């Protein structure tokens, strides 16, 4: 059975880059454009891993991550923050919100795929 990855990203081009990177793998890919859609997608089908952009409309990645990690049934899902928000301390803020890892944009597809495999192996 293939592992499920939820890609939470509001930029279509960024979703496409991630989708293109994951298509050759055996992962099942679901997508959401904001934190609210992510929570709805998780309620329908629990992912094995979440790639979470931080700057999202409606509900940002921090708020969505906090909601996911507050739920005992969901808190074990690894969340990798993928963000172009390049403030000093951004990784620490993401981890404080509950993200398990952090990958800055632009990212190396090889680096991101290695992190995904690390959490799904």
For each predicted feature, which ranges?
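The feature encodes the CheY-like receiver
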Residues: 57, 75, 87, 105-106
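Active-site beta3 strand of CheY-like receiver
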Residues: 45-51, 56
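C-terminal output helix
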Residues: 107-116
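Two-component/phosphorelay signaling modules centered on CheY-like receiver
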Residues: 12-30, 44, 119
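Hydrophobic residue at a beta-alpha junction
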Residues: 32-33, 56-59, 68, 89
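Conserved acidic carboxylate
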Residues: 9
């Amino acid at each position: 059975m293939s592992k499920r990855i939820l890609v939470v990203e509001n930029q279509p081009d960024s979703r496409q880059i991630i989708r293109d990177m994951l298509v050759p793998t055996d992962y099942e890919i679901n997508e959401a454009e904001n934190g609210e859609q992510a929570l709805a997608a998780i309620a329908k089908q629990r992912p094995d891993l979440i790639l979470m952009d931080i700057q999202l409309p409606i509900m940002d990645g921090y708020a969505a991550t906090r909601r996911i990690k507050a739920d005992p049934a969901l808190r074990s899902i690894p969340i990798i923050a993928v963000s172009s928000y390049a403030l000093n301390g951004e990784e620490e803020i993401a981890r404080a919100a509950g993200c398990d890892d952090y990958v800055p944009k632009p990212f190396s597809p090889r680096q991101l795929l290695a992190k995904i495999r690390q959490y799904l192996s």
